[in-house]
Amino acid sequence: SEVILGKDKKIQEVELEKLLQSSNETVSLLVLNQLLEVNKNSKQKSISFIDQLLNTKKFSKKNIKFLKIKKSLLVFDTATEVEMLNLIDLKSKDSSFKKMSFEIMYDFYISKKQNLKANDLKRLIDEN
């Protein structure tokens, strides 16, 4: 990893993209974080990397939720409510990310000036 990070940005990105397809879940997630950092000015590329991982179907349920939350933060400004609800799991009772999911949707509703929905979520957040 350190060898890759010391190289030219384009070469670095190509080599990281190869590693992204690793069969090792941990390696893929660590590489994703590096790719997101390298491409922090390109939301589309970052979303594409997350989609690649989501489409491989090689991750645990917990990591799939984690990837979807990452994606929801990247698409936050342009997403529709349906897109956000498809990414954020508000129904799961045992989610490790339940409170965070509620808070992201709360912020989404506030940003879209949907105050009634935001207030409903705020009540649920405060109850938990």
Model-derived features: where do they sit?
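Extracytoplasmic/periplasmic/luminal assembly and interaction segments
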Residues: 4-59
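Soluble extracytoplasmic domains of inner/organellar membrane proteins
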Residues: 49-128
